[in-house]
From Swiss-Prot:
Pfam families the UniProt entry points to: HLH (PF00010), PAS (PF00989), PAS_11 (PF14598)
Domain PAS: 107-177, 262-332
One term of GO molecular function: protein dimerization activity
Species the sequence originates in: Tyto alba (Barn owl)
InterPro entries attached to this UniProt entry: bHLH_dom, CLOCK-like, HLH_DNA-bd_sf, Nuc_translocat, PAC, PAS, PAS-like_dom_sf, PAS_fold
Protein name: Circadian locomoter output cycles protein kaput
Compartment list: Cytoplasm; Nucleus; Cytoplasm, Cytosol
Keyword Zinc in record: no
Location of the PAC domain: 336-379
UniProt PTM comment: Ubiquitinated, leading to its proteasomal degradation. O-glycosylated; contains O-GlcNAc. O-glycosylation by OGT prevents protein degradation by inhibiting ubiquitination. It also stabilizes the CLOCK-BMAL1 heterodimer thereby increasing CLOCK-BMAL1-mediated transcriptional activation of PER1/2/3 and CRY1/2.
Length: 851
């Protein structure tokens, strides 16, 4: 029983132990599982973070855009860090010491300032003489733009007599190929030499001038420079004789002037469109300067106020500026030429000014001149002046390395030397013909040692400065065989490559220069032709406008003058008195004389009478050719003012057409209180074959006299004429020629003499007044029918004979030509009408006047 109980207790204890063990195992498993889960989470988090960092690092590394594995990313990162460490070490080694460099200046800025202070510039030259970099400080020193020298041979800018020496210096490392290692290139290779360099000019045809300069530099090793073409000299020196690093060496030098310049042009313009405003008096003294001027010119406003602007201008620009200022004073506004302004730092800066004159608002007097000055670069100035000279200048060449720079506008000359060398490492190498063609122009000099610092030579071929597009294309076509042939023909040895180069290039430039000069002359002639044609069109337009204005003024004067003459005729009609006219006969004789008379710019000339008729007639000659052609209008504009028995001494001028009328000159023949005598000698033949002439003269007392012949002259005294003014029109274009001629021919059986005198009897004036009334009626009819006026005396008939004294003055309202026959036929019809009228009057005995 006891055994049974104990056995039961033992079994219960064993079961209890097994359960506890199982529970313990379960608890341990749960703990391990929790630990694994926690560990897995932490591992996953770490891996995720590592992947994110690798991905971010891969995105920052340069290279392909493809996905890289972790090891590649880490490897490139290590390489980048190593390279960065090396560059940092080199920068620290080349860093300028802070004890003599200001902290606010970068290395590039400090280097530029030092070059300007030392009158020097940087120059990087390959061993074959090709220039790969030049700093901008060359512009104020030698007046070259950096683009003029980049990618050209240095031998183009050095006298020919110094080529061999410079070539030996640049190729000196070839002779030391054993000792010249990359380590040597980094340390003990400093080189100094002196030579002459060509100065730049605006006109390439000017006489070349050379400046004496000093080169101080050393050879630099370029790691990734592609193999050079050596400008066509591969056949001269075998490739196997050259060291492997020859093509990767360039000569970097600082070029300084032997004679320093105290005043230089500002070489760099940070912002070419910078401008400032100033105000000047009429004497060109500063009155105002705005706040933008001090950073540009260096002067504060109080430093320039009251001083003349001419104190700051370059002496070579004074003449052009004076002409511009004269233009300003004449037109009130304008634009100046390019000129140099002296800054406070003793540098010349190029400016262009727009100015205008301001006037007082009350009295309109000029007060002062407002100027807006704009900063311009030397490249713009040179391009503009070369265009004025008819020289085509191509734009600065953009190298291939710049085209690879996306969005960059900086040229190779605006970067540092280090960047230029790096760009040259990746830039494509020009072909042999292209590289050789750029060394095309050379100028022969007599003796480079004639002057120590500056040398002027007289040559027929101008030096090479810049190449236009068509020149470079023509020169690139030159082959290497032509270069070697020309070098042999000129006697240059093959062992000296660069000595054969100038001769080759001189021939090439001689061939391309006539084409360039011809194109430049053709462009200049075309430009001049366009300017002349434009100026001609402007002058013609002004002439047409002035002619139109003159025509309108003449029409107005004609209208006013016609109205005044009508009133004058009405007033003078009441004062006319007529006397009797007696015709007497005399012996016949021939009087033939031509007497020219000058009468206020007009010529009055007597002509011979035809068929024995004594006639005095002053009229416009229809044999003179006039310039304009309107004969019909002229014939219808003629008008005869006829008197009854005596001469009516007044002239009416009126035109019904709208043609251009000339200005009139008035000739006044005054009548004294005594009787005015008009003598008409008449010597008429008995037969039809003899002719007689009436000679008309004017005396100083303004009397009209006909010179006496050998026969009897009878005198008749007529009543005084109230109006003694004879108005003779004259044209403003040409002097009017008036000739006396007979209107019609009639045979005279008896000589006749007409004399007009003045009567004083008051009783006869009443009868003459009645005659005036009857005589004016046909005259008024003729006046309304014919606008052009003639002054004629009355014709008196005695039996079947007739005599006439006609004084006519033609009004040249239109310059025209007309035939004599048509004019005489028109006058003959008028004379016949007058004959009928006078015959009726003479038959009336109450109208007769006793002698």
């Amino acid at each position: 029983m006891f055994f049974t109980i104990s056995t039961h207790k033992m079994s219960s204890i064993a079961d209890r132990n097994d359960g506890s063990i199982f529970d313990g195992l379960v608890e341990e498993d749960d703990k391990d599982k929790a630990k694994r889960v926690s560990r897995n989470k932490s591992e996953k988090k770490r891996r995720d973070q590592f992947n994110v960092l690798i991905k971010e690092l891969g995105s920052m590394l340069p290279g392909n855009a493809r996905k890289m594995d972790k090891s590649t990313v880490l490897q490139k990162s290590i390489d980048f860090l190593r390279k960065h460490k090396e560059i940092t070490a080199q920068s620290d080694a080349s860093e300028i010491r802070q004890d003599w460099k200001p902290t606010f200046l970068s290395n590039e800025e400090f280097t530029q300032l030092m070059l300007e202070a030392l009158d020097g510039f940087f120059l990087a030259i390959m061993t074959d003489g090709n220039i790969i970099y030049v700093s901008e400080s060359i512009t104020p020193l030698l007046e070259h733009l950096p683009s003029d020298l980049v990618d050209q041979s240095v031998f183009n800018f050095i006298p020919e007599g110094e080529h061999s020496e410079i070539y030996k210096i640049l190729s000196s490392h070839l002779l030391e190929s054993d000792s010249l290692t990359p380590e040597y290139l980094k340390s003990k290779n400093q080189l100094e030499f002196c030579c002459h360099m060509l100065r730049g000019t605006i006109d390439p045809k000017e006489q070349p001038t050379y400046e004496y300069v000093k080169f101080i530099g050393n050879f630099k090793c370029l790691n990734n420079v592609p193999n050079s073409a050596h400008n066509g000299f591969e056949g001269t020196i075998q490739r196997s004789h050259r060291p492997s690093y020859e093509d990767k060496v360039c000569f970097v030098a600082t070029v300084r002037l032997a004679t320093p310049q105290f005043i230089k042009e500002m070489c760099t313009v940070e912002e070419p469109n910078e401008e400032f405003t100033s105000r000047h008096s009429l004497e060109w003294k500063f009155l105002f300067l705005d706040h933008r001027a001090p950073p540009i010119i260096g002067y504060l406003p109080f430093e320039v106020l009251g001083t003349s602007g001419y104190d700051y201008y370059h002496v070579d620009d004074l003449d052009n500026l004076a002409k511009c200022h004269e233009h300003l004073m004449q037109y009130g506004k304008g634009k100046s030429c390019y000129y140099r302004f002296l800054t406070k730092g003793q540098q010349w800066i190029w400016l262009q000014t727009h100015y205008y004159i301001t006037y007082h608002q009350w009295n309109s007097r000029p007060e002062f001149i407002v100027c807006t000055h704009t900063v311009v670069s030397y490249a713009e100035v040179r391009a503009e002046r070369r265009r004025e000279l008819g020289i085509e200048e191509s734009l600065p060449e953009i190298t291939g390395d710049k085209s690879q720079d996306s969005g960059s506008d900086n040229h190779i000359n605006t970067v540092s030397l280090k960047e230029a060398l790096e760009r040259f490492d990746t830039s494509p190498t020009p072909s042999a013909s292209s590289r050789s063609s750029r060394k095309s122009s050379h100028t022969a000099v007599s003796d480079h040692s004639s002057t120590p610092t500056k040398m002027t030579v007289d040559t027929s071929t101008p030096p090479r400065q810049s190449l236009s597009g068509h020149e470079k294309t023509a020169q690139r076509r030159s082959s290497l065989s032509s270069q070697s042939l020309s070098s042999q023909s000129l006697g240059q040895p093959v062992a000296q490559p660069t000595m054969s180069q100038p001769s080759t290039l001189q021939l090439q430039s001689g061939m391309s220069q006539p084409v360039f000069q011809f194109s430049a002359q053709l462009g200049a002639m075309q430009h001049l032709k366009d300017q002349l044609e434009q100026r001609t069109r402007m002058i013609e337009a002004n002439i047409h406008r002035q002619q139109e204005e003159l025509r309108k003024i003449q029409e107005q004067l004609q209208i006013v003058h016609g109205q005044g003459l009508q009133m004058f005729l009405q007033q003078s009609a009441s004062g006319l008195n007529f006397g009797s006219v007696q015709l007497a006969s005399g012996n016949s004789s021939n009087v033939q004389q031509l007497t020219p008379i000058n009468m206020q710019g007009q010529v009055v000339q007597t002509n011979q009478t035809q068929s024995g008729m004594s006639t005095g007639h002053i009229s416009a000659p229809h044999m003179i050719q006039q310039q304009s052609l309107q004969s019909t209008a002229t014939q219808h504009n003629q008008q005869n003012v006829l008197s009854g028995h005596t001469q009516q001494s007044s002239l009416a001028s009126q035109s019904q057409n709208t043609v251009s009328a000339p200005l009139y000159n008035t000739m006044v023949i005054s009548q004294p209180t005594t009787g005015n005598v008009v003598q008409v000698p008449s010597s008429l033949p008995q037969n039809n074959n003899q002719n007689a002439a009436a000679v008309t003269t004017f005396t100083q007392d303004r009397q009209i006299r006909f010179s006496q012949g050998q026969q009897l002259v009878t005198k008749l005294v007529t009543a005084p004429v109230a109006c003694g003014a004879v108005m003779v029109p004259s044209t403003m274009f040409m002097g009017q020629v008036v000739t006396a001629y007979p209107t019609f021919a009639a045979q005279q059986q008896q000589p006749q003499t007409l004399s007009i005198t003045q009567q004083q009897q008051q009783s006869q004036q009443d009868q003459q007044q009645q005659q005036l009334t009857t005589a004016q009626q046909p005259a008024q009819q003729q006046l309304t029918q014919h606008p052009q006026q003639f002054l004629q005396t009355s014709r008196l008939l005695h039996g079947n004979q007739s005599a006439q004294l006609i004084l006519s003055a033609a009004f040249p309202l239109q310059q025209s030509t007309f035939t004599q026959s048509h004019h005489q036929q028109h006058q003959s019809q008028q004379q016949q009408q007058l004959v009928r009228h006078r015959t009726d009057k003479m038959t009336d005995p109450s109208k007769a006047q006793p002698q």
